[in-house]
Amino acid sequence: MKLSIQRYGSGEPIVLIHGMGSAATAWKPIIPALSKEFEVFTVDLPGHGQTPLDKSQPMDPSSLARLVLLNLSELGVQQFHLVGNSLGGWVSLEIAATNPDRVKSLTGLAPAGLWLAPFTSRYPGELAVRLMAKSLDKVAATTLNYKWAKKIGFETVSPRWEQLSYEICLDAVAAMAKSEGYFPVWDGMLKKRFDKEISADIPVTIIFGDTDHTLPAKTCQERSLAPKHAKWIILPETGHAPMWDSTEDVIAEIMQTTKQCK
């Protein structure tokens, strides 16, 4: 199936892959800086953003990795740097593990899949989160002007929720509300974890926030599952979307990682 992929800037290709229930719009804070150095490709996964859900498309991370690779090949993008958040981080790890000749570097922002005990069922309350986003979508443009609404929607996502821009919040609510692929992706992750090796020739940086309530350190940040050569960073006052909370730090780490490729 064809994925919606947007392009910005010029230079070496760098591919950005969003998380579950999100969309390519999540990358807005870092696109301007990256597009000065790279040709930036932002991907909408199936049932997310501008890519419709295809019920025949397998939604596990390995299958999504193959789908992203196929779409990049069709665009003539053979070698590229990778940046992925949450589910997108897991998909990026799969791409690097299975196609090391195509990946020049990898930066994982709170990547999923690094858990010793895979999930066997969906998180309790996930349906409520999705339903709340759908119910608020039509009024979000107004309600997000109020501090109480912003707090309800983003307090568990970001310790700096008060500082998040109106645009980031509005985009996030819209992405979640429209993410028909949300539960198919959840089900595609069940009973799985990232368990492959990644070539030491590929520079890898893993970044987590110190306040990640979605993938907490105790259960979902198992370093033994990450590449042994990976640089591991914990950013202060940062939640599950480091590119929102620590934008400049994330940009700097991405730049540094890309410069290490051979």
Task: Give names to the regions the model predicted.
Residues A141-I198:
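Conserved alpha/beta-hydrolase catalytic His-Asp/Glu region
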Residues Q6-L53:
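Conserved HGGG/HGGXW glycine-rich cap/lid loop of the alpha/beta-hydrolase fold
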Residues K178-L225:
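Conserved serine/cysteine hydrolase catalytic core
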